[in-house]
């Protein structure tokens, strides 16, 4: 199915859908570490969780932070990585996990 066909299929099924999962990566201290990623406008129809993987190593699934009043949501890597940020030389993958099916979908990747 083409991207266009998928979009119009969603428009038919859902009617109104507004989201923005463009990742905003937050650097730590020192600044060669990534501490967070924030998604500007997330889906709120379910209590989605996130799974984080670093260079192919699964760091697990954690409960998500509350959605902010502007619709954004933050994923804090310190909670996945024993209180440490993730070196920006690594590949960081963030997956959103559907609470109904436990299926996960990649939503952001660093490197």
Curated annotation (Swiss-Prot):
Keyword tags? Acetylation
Q: What is this protein called?
A: Immunomodulatory protein Ling Zhi-8
* Record field: transmembrane: none
GO annotation, biological process: regulation of immune system process
Which organism was this protein described from? Ganoderma lucidum
Indicate where the modification N-acetylserine is found in the sequence. Answer: 2
Instruction: Cite a single Pfam family from the UniProt record.
Output: Fve
| Entry superkingdom | Eukaryota
GO molecular function ontology, one term from the record? carbohydrate binding
Record family assignment: Belongs to the fungal immunomodulatory protein (FIP) family.
């Amino acid at each position: 199915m083409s991207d266009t066909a998928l979009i119009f299929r969603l428009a038919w099924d859902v009617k109104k859908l507004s989201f923005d999962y463009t990742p905003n990566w937050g650097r730590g201290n020192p600044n060669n570490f990534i501490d967070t990623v924030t998604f500007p406008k997330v889906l709120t129809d379910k209590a989605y969780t996130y799974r984080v993987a670093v260079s192919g190593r699964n760091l697990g699934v954690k409960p998500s932070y509350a959605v902010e009043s502007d619709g954004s949501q933050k994923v804090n890597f310190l909670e996945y990585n024993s209180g440490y940020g993730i070196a920006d030389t690594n590949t960081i993958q963030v997956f959103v996990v559907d609470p109904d099916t436990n299926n996960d979908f990649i939503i952001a990747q660093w490197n």
